[in-house]
């Protein structure tokens, strides 16, 4: 199994690269994000206050009025993500990803895992330790 991490600045095209690779490669691909579990967690926190579709880029720009005038969904994602990393373990989200990758490997039907939101050194290290490679997208 091939693991390809994709890094780059915000809106540099990381997901676009993953989508093209998945679409035009002959490999059976799946795309995972380190932020998937974080978004699920934050979505659950926000359910009582309305519907926030975390899969949409525009959602990150929405303000959460009861959290303060300028507090956005992006701020919530950053704060919650960092809180888990700082309070529990720096590898909190990495460990979740390792579990997801192990489940996919066990299933055996996927050739390539694409991870288009590699940001932190421990995320790079995890991919390298699992025999993968990391691509950098420049715009």
Identify what each model region corresponds to.
Residues 22-31:
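Post-Walker A helix-loop "phosphate-sensing" segment adjacent to the P-loop in P-loop NTPases
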Residues 11-12:
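ATP-binding Walker
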Residues 36-110:
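ATP-dependent small-molecule kinase phosphotransfer cores
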Residues 8:
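The Walker A (P-loop) glycine that initiates the GxxxxGKT/S ATP-binding motif of P-loop NTPases
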Residues 1-4:
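Extreme N-terminal starter segment of soluble prokaryotic enzymes
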Residues 15:
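Walker A/P-loop
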Residues 28, 96-139:
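ATP-dependent NMP and nucleoside kinases share a basic, alpha-helical "lid"
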């Amino acid at each position: 199994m091939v693991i390809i991490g994709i890094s780059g600045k915000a809106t540099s095209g990381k997901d676009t690269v993953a989508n093209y690779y998945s679409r035009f490669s002959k490999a059976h691909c799946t795309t995972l994000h380190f932020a998937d579990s974080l978004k699920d967690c934050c979505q659950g926190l926000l359910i009582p206050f309305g519907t926030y579709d975390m899969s949409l880029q525009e959602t990150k720009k929405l303000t959460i009025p009861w959290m303060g005038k300028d507090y956005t969904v992006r701020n919530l994602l950053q704060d919650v993500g960092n809180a888990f990393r700082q309070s529990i373990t720096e590898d909190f989200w990495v460990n979740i990803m390792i579990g997801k990758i192990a489940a996919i490997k066990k299933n055996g039907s996927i050739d390539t895992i694409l991870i288009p939101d590699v940001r932190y050194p421990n995320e790079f290290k995890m991919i390298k330790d699992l025999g993968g490679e990391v691509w950098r997208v420049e715009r």
